[in-house]
């Protein structure tokens, strides 16, 4: 699938003239002030200004050496020897990074932290209701959930290279799903939970998804979006072979189609807690993210591992 670029257009403003004319002079002055970071903040920075300038200069003068060193920060199953392979000739644009390297993104995000950070927080989930307590999910818990979801996907016939559309609110299961796909070599595509059934159907069909992961409803700002109902409407325009994995997030009642819809909570609870990470080439597709469509039909941008 080709890589595309798009530009972001700001929405037209409901007033004419400069925005500054609408802001009181005193507030305008404050908006133009600069705020230097505190000495404590500066002392704890991973990279200070001088080091940044040094790194940037080397990245320009010796890009292969610079990125070869940066690649050492990752855990590789096979370390790359070919770092940068690019061509910008007209009609022959080709960009490859670490093309003979082998790794697994999920392993780098989760597994390698278990030795020293198993009980540290990996994800903080803030529920929509401000009165509900935040959830702190440790690396050990994240590892368990990701492995279980990976095994669920395998049980549903998802294989290396298959596409999985994720149509979820910002809940932990969204992170589990992305990492589970990376673990088994499936390609995920996030669809914003505020998108319409038509937009969802277009993306499912365009990438040829085998699975859609959604939730019953998505609470936001005191309101609920019926994600499962939207998914039902979208799948009317998709192949009848697409399966639907449903996260019971709010517990709201939803329609259910036997043979197509699957209770993801139940399957994860009963799935095996271990799934070995698949070796993936650095240039293997990791995810597909669709452009806004401001220049026509949304285009799938493929991001490599």
In which residue ranges do the predicted regions lie?
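N-terminal amphipathic, basic-rich helices that act as targeting or association modules
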Residues: 31-95
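A short N-terminal helical cap/helix-turn-helix that marks the beginning
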Residues: 60-82, 100-124, 283
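AMP-dependent adenylate-forming
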Residues: 109-137, 251-255
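Conserved pre-ATP/AMP-binding loop-to-beta segment of ANL
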Residues: 119-121, 245-247, 257-290, 297, ...
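Conserved AMP-binding/adenylate-forming core of the ANL superfamily
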Residues: 123-179, 196-201, 260-269, 305
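Conserved S/T- and glycine-rich ATP-binding loop of Class I adenylate-forming
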Residues: 164, 181, 285, 291-294
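Structural core segment of the AMP-binding/adenylate-forming
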Residues: 183-266
């Amino acid at each position: 699938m080709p890589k595309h670029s798009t530009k972001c257009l700001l929405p037209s403003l409901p007033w004419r003239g400069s925005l500054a004319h609408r802001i009181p002079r005193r507030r305008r002055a404050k908006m133009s002030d600069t705020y230097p970071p505190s000495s404590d903040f500066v002392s704890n920075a991973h990279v200070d200004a001088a080091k940044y300038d040094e790194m940037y200069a080397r990245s320009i003068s010796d890009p292969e050496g610079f990125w070869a060193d940066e690649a050492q920060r990752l855990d590789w199953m096979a370390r790359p020897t070919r770092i940068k392979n690019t061509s910008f000739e007209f009609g022959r644009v080709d960009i490859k990074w670490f093309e003979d390297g082998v790794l697994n993104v999920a392993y780098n995000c989760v597994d390698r932290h278990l030795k020293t950070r198993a009980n540290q927080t990996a994800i903080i989930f803030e529920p929509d209701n401000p009165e509900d307590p935040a959830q702190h999910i440790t690396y050990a818990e994240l590892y368990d959930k990701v492995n279980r979801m990976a095994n669920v996907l395998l049980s549903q016939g998802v294989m290396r290279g298959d596409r999985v559309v994720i149509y979820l609110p910002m809940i932990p299961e969204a992170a589990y799903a992305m990492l589970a796909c990376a673990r088994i070599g499936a390609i995920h595509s996030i669809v914003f939970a505020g998108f319409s059934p038509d937009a969802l159907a277009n993306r499912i069909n365009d990438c040829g998804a085998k699975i859609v992961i959604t939730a019953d409803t998505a609470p936001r700002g005191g309101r609920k979006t019926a994600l499962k109902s939207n998914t039902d409407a979208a799948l009317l325009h998709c192949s009848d072979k697409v399966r639907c994995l449903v996260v019971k997030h709010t517990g709201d009642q939803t329609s259910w189609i036997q043979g197509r819809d699957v209770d993801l909570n139940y399957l994860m609870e009963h799935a095996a807690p271990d799934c070995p990470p698949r070796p993936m080439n650095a240039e293997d597709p990791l995810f597909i993210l669709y452009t806004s469509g401001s220049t026509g039909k949304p285009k799938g941008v493929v991001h490599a591992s």
